[in-house]
Amino acid sequence: MKVKTIMLLFQILAISTIKSADVPNRYIQENVAVRGKATQSTLPSGAGAVLSLPGFAIDGNRDSDFSHGSCSHTTNSPNPWWRVDLLQLYTITSVTITNRGDCCGERISGARILIGNSLENNGINNPACSVIGSMETGETRTFHCPQPMIGRYVTVYLPKTEVLQLCEVEVNALLPVN
């Protein structure tokens, strides 16, 4: 156990000095969100609830049409958030988000992508990887962290009263090549 812990610390130190665009040869980037469990601040009620589940944002499907059942969707509420528990620590370099494509693309403006190990305040107190200034309706964009970040929880937090809708969230982590 001590050897594994020491090796993990050396790996963390080695990759903490690289920028997200510079992936060392002994590592690959992989979307680890599909392995996780998603939750969100609220769920719509009624017929729309079945199309709004938080897990739809990590199903590996970038379909941006809400009616196709591959997007998460909160209610219109103050400070909505969506979070994926990656179930273990990862070194995260970037997060790729697909915005809703059939309407309302402007709703995501100002959202913050937060990464860390704390669930305090629903993960909103974790450090920021990036802020979404604006996105086109249906756009898929990768947001690079200024440096690799180690964390278990990735939260998308919208600091205003609005609906938060995410059609895909991909968490790009460095994994050692075996």
UniProtKB/Swiss-Prot annotation:
Predominant localisation class: secreted
Q: Which GO terms describe its biological process?
A: regulation of cellular defense response; regulation of complement activation, lectin pathway; regulation of innate immune response
Residues at which Ca(2+) binds: D59, N61, S70, C167, E168
Q: Where is the signal peptide?
A: 1-20
Tell me where the sequence motif Cell attachment site sits in this chain.
100-102
Please report any disulfide bonds recorded for this protein chain, giving both cysteine positions. Answer: C71-C167, C103-C104, C129-C145
Tissue pattern of expression reads: Parenchymal hepatocytes.
Residue stretches in coiled coil: none
Question: What InterPro entries does the entry give?
Answer: BG_Antigen-Binding_Lectin (IPR051941), FTP1 (IPR006585), Galactose-bd-like_sf (IPR008979)
Q: Which parts of the sequence are annotated with region: F5/8 type C-like?
A: 29-178
Q: Which UniProt keywords apply?
A: Calcium, Disulfide bond, Lectin, Metal-binding, Secreted, Signal
Tell me if Calcium is a UniProt keyword of this record. yes
Binding-site residues, alpha-L-fucose? H73, R100, R107
Offer a single GO CC term for the protein: extracellular space
Q: Name one GO molecular function term.
A: fucose binding
Tell where it localizes.
Answer: Secreted, Extracellular space
PANTHER family noted in UniProt: FTP DOMAIN-CONTAINING PROTEIN, SI:CH211-215K15.4
- Assembly and interactions? Homotrimer.
Described by its record, this protein's role is as follows:
Acts as a defensive agent. Recognizes blood group fucosylated oligosaccharides including A, B, H and Lewis B-type antigens. Does not recognize Lewis A antigen and has low affinity for monovalent haptens.
Miscellaneous comment in the UniProt entry for this protein: Binds 1 calcium ion per monomer.
Q: Give the family this protein belongs to, as stated in its UniProt record.
A: Belongs to the fucolectin family.
Query: What is the protein name given in its UniProt record?
Result: Fucolectin-1
